[in-house]
Amino acid sequence: MALTMLLLLVAAALTLIETRAGQHSLQYFHTAVSRPGLGEPWFISVGYVDDTQFVRFDSDAENPRMEPRARWMEQEGPEYWERETQIAKGHEQSFRGSLRTAQSYYNQSKGGSHTLQWMYGCDMGSDGRLLRGYLQFAYEGRDYIALNEDLKTWTAVDMAAQITRRKWEQAGIAEKDQAYLEGTCMQSLRRYLELGKETL
């Protein structure tokens, strides 16, 4: 009986490993934290392929740049790192503005510390196609607004987020995000899986 149970557990574990081995994900997490009296908000960005952190940007670094966090990313040339650094700095500026906007929506003073988070990414199925894309924002550690599974509409959790939703609908932001998640995100994931094929 014990041997049968052990074999069943091993078989279940192998099934989980095989299922997981065929699926992969690319995720980015961005966070901005206001620091009254200390200058601009702190901004950090990290990227993961599956459960492996592969890039990081920290606005408080001596020379803020997108940096490799996985050995296999060291294969990328200087043009890649310059481009990714510029993208991260663009996110940093945009995020700081969004943090100020959220503070105004919630009638909060600039004197306190506030946090804005953004998470997005794509999951690839074992067939190499998009399994799901996702994008969501949180303010002060609570859900704020999220792109729905259809990648066309938004869920806004409160009145402040409704303002953002209306602005984004008018600007066609969902369409741009959908194009990124279905296109660039998946292409990037395939590239990173190739670069890290020995360890991922």
From Swiss-Prot:
<dbReference type="GO" id="GO:0071346">
    <property type="term" value="P:cellular response to type II interferon"/>
</dbReference>
<dbReference type="GO" id="GO:0030670">
    <property type="term" value="C:phagocytic vesicle membrane"/>
</dbReference>
<keyword id="KW-1015">Disulfide bond</keyword>
<feature type="topological domain" description="Extracellular">
    <location>
        <begin position="22"/>
        <end position="200"/>
    </location>
</feature>
<dbReference type="GO" id="GO:0042605">
    <property type="term" value="F:peptide antigen binding"/>
</dbReference>
<dbReference type="GO" id="GO:0009897">
    <property type="term" value="C:external side of plasma membrane"/>
</dbReference>
<comment type="function">
    <text>Involved in the presentation of foreign antigens to the immune system.</text>
</comment>
<dbReference type="GO" id="GO:0001916">
    <property type="term" value="P:positive regulation of T cell mediated cytotoxicity"/>
</dbReference>
<keyword id="KW-0490">MHC I</keyword>
<dbReference type="GO" id="GO:0032729">
    <property type="term" value="P:positive regulation of type II interferon production"/>
</dbReference>
<feature type="region of interest" description="Alpha-1">
    <location>
        <begin position="22"/>
        <end position="111"/>
    </location>
</feature>
<comment type="similarity">
    <text>Belongs to the MHC class I family.</text>
</comment>
<dbReference type="InterPro" id="IPR001039">
    <property type="entry name" value="MHC_I_a_a1/a2"/>
</dbReference>
<comment type="subunit">
    <text>Heterodimer of an alpha chain and a beta chain (beta-2-microglobulin).</text>
</comment>
<dbReference type="InterPro" id="IPR011162">
    <property type="entry name" value="MHC_I/II-like_Ag-recog"/>
</dbReference>
<keyword id="KW-0732">Signal</keyword>
<dbReference type="GO" id="GO:0009986">
    <property type="term" value="C:cell surface"/>
</dbReference>
<dbReference type="GO" id="GO:0051607">
    <property type="term" value="P:defense response to virus"/>
</dbReference>
<dbReference type="InterPro" id="IPR037055">
    <property type="entry name" value="MHC_I-like_Ag-recog_sf"/>
</dbReference>
<dbReference type="GO" id="GO:0042612">
    <property type="term" value="C:MHC class I protein complex"/>
</dbReference>
<feature type="disulfide bond">
    <location>
        <begin position="122"/>
        <end position="185"/>
    </location>
</feature>
<dbReference type="GO" id="GO:0032398">
    <property type="term" value="C:MHC class Ib protein complex"/>
</dbReference>
<dbReference type="GO" id="GO:0002474">
    <property type="term" value="P:antigen processing and presentation of peptide antigen via MHC class I"/>
</dbReference>
<dbReference type="GO" id="GO:0002476">
    <property type="term" value="P:antigen processing and presentation of endogenous peptide antigen via MHC class Ib"/>
</dbReference>
<keyword id="KW-0391">Immunity</keyword>
<feature type="region of interest" description="Alpha-2">
    <location>
        <begin position="112"/>
        <end position="200"/>
    </location>
</feature>
<dbReference type="Pfam" id="PF00129">
    <property type="entry name" value="MHC_I"/>
</dbReference>
<dbReference type="InterPro" id="IPR050208">
    <property type="entry name" value="MHC_class-I_related"/>
</dbReference>
<keyword id="KW-0325">Glycoprotein</keyword>
<feature type="signal peptide">
    <location>
        <begin position="1"/>
        <end position="21"/>
    </location>
</feature>
<dbReference type="GO" id="GO:0098553">
    <property type="term" value="C:lumenal side of endoplasmic reticulum membrane"/>
</dbReference>
<protein>
    <recommendedName>
        <fullName>H-2 class I histocompatibility antigen, Q9 alpha chain</fullName>
    </recommendedName>
</protein>
<keyword id="KW-0472">Membrane</keyword>
<dbReference type="InterPro" id="IPR011161">
    <property type="entry name" value="MHC_I-like_Ag-recog"/>
</dbReference>
<feature type="glycosylation site" description="N-linked (GlcNAc...) asparagine">
    <location>
        <position position="107"/>
    </location>
</feature>
